[in-house]
Design a protein with these regions (language model features):
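Long, contiguous binding/interaction regions
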Residues: 1-57, 61-114
Length: 114
């Protein structure tokens, strides 16, 4: 899944979104979505990367528990056949809930042909 495909998937949620963070002073009112690739878990053999696999995070921020917004994000992930794990935390300093969707995606743009 390319960066452009992930961006399109974020747009499908209908929420404001950004990669990693919004610029200083440009953060929208919640709910909003941030996505990023915190690490990779590539398939390697014989000193060669055969499959590039990125960990992808979709971070949903809300100022109150909003199950309907979570369902909106999950519907998009489900429609793309994405398998994800979900965690939630309250961030007291920000007065926001973060619902984290963690998943692994193949980096199709860099797959090597066999």
């Amino acid at each position: 899944m390319t960066y452009e495909e992930v961006t399109a998937m974020a747009a499908e949620t209908g929420l404001p979104y950004a990669y990693d963070h919004f610029a200083e002073g440009e953060s929208p009112e919640p709910p909003f979505l941030v996505f990023l690739y915190p690490r990779s878990d590539n398939f390697v053999a014989d000193g060669k990367v055969y499959r590039k696999i990125n960990e992808l995070h979709f971070e949903l921020y809300t100022d109150a528990k909003q199950p309907e917004v979570e369902e909106q994000v999950e519907a998009v992930l489900d429609s793309h056949g994405i398998v994800y794990d979900k965690t939630e935390v309250w961030i007291p300093e920000e007065k926001l809930y973060e619902v984290l969707y963690s998943m692994e995606v193949l980096n199709d743009g860099n797959e090597q042909e066999e």
